[in-house]
Amino acid sequence: MSRLIVCLTVMVFVLVAPACTIPTGTNSVVDIPATSPAVATPDLLPADDPPAGDGVTVSPEPFPSARVPVSAPLAERISAAVATASAERGADMSIAVLDRATGSYLEGAAAEPVETASLAKLFVAAQMYHLDALGERPLSDFDNVLLKRMLESSDDDAANTLWDDLGGSDVVVDVAGRYGLAATTPPWDGLWWNTETTAADLVTFYAGLLDDRDGLGADRIAEFVGYLRSSTPEGIDGYDQRFGIPDGLPGENVVGVKQGWMCCVGDRWIHVSTGLIGEDNRYIVAVASREDIRYEDDEESYPDTAVTDVSEDSSARHARDTMTGFVKSLFPNGVVDDWAQPQG
């Protein structure tokens, strides 16, 4: 029976009011170690994993524990949650927060690189809408079907088709240039899921999209956001897409999300959760994680998550729970409003 070892880095981002410029280097909370080159594929799970409940040593108390002070300001909660996740879950985490209405911004290790996994599908969609707006490649009915499946259900086949049709890695170069994503780079191997970005760049991308930095027009932006708001509870591969933001913010009625997951990169699970919060998309949240996993017999393997169903894998579930618990510890009332204020 194969096993895997995994480690997790978490990035969280929240945004709020049109046409915001994200400050850099402010309110840094935690430094995250640099990531290693990606060696895996996205949005699927390991072969021959142990039965549910096996393998991962789980903290005797739920995450987050009482060591995360719910009444403290967000900056203090971030610091406590990062430390607690590392100690209790074997998880490294980073976060960036922006309120588009006020321009308030907070970050922790938001400049650390992370593989996008399925977050690269956002860049594919942005390129499709860009070319449609220019009239260079009008969207066909089939294109719209692929966009819907790719964004709502994280369909890898749809992403593969559009990625190849658009020229592969050129998509990342073009989108990064138009949106000012200074730390976002194309995949080293030409595979979209190995694109690298940062928490800060993901926040910048969403802010630029909502502010129409690329000249897409209101209708295209509304369609793009509509797909994110229609995200399915499970991906097309059966993987639970509610981790992180959706389950972590149960009090938010209007949430648009794009999720990503894959294993193994540097012997780690990668999970990414990003979202637009509120009817007016005032807030944008993004969370990325890397979590080390060790099964009880310590046997190591590197599952190909592009071809194997890991929806019931205990290590993946543990990492998802870490993501959700982290978000809950930052927003214990289950909503993002007044995030800079004590939430006791």
Listing of model-derived features with the role each one plays in the protein:
Residues M1-V12, D143:
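N-terminal export and membrane-targeting signals
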Residues V16-A19:
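C-terminal motif of bacterial Sec signal peptides marking the signal peptidase cleavage site
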Residues T21-P23:
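Bacterial signal peptide processing site
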Residues G25-P33, P37-M93, D164-G344:
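Penicillin-recognizing serine hydrolase domain
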Residues S86-P113:
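Short, conserved catalytic-motif segment at the N-terminal edge
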Residues S94-L98, F123, A286:
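Soluble periplasmic/extracytoplasmic beta-strand elements of cell-envelope proteins
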Residues G103, P113-R137, M150, V285:
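Active-site SXXK
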Residues H130-R149, G168-S169, G217-R220:
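Short, well-structured active-site flanking segments
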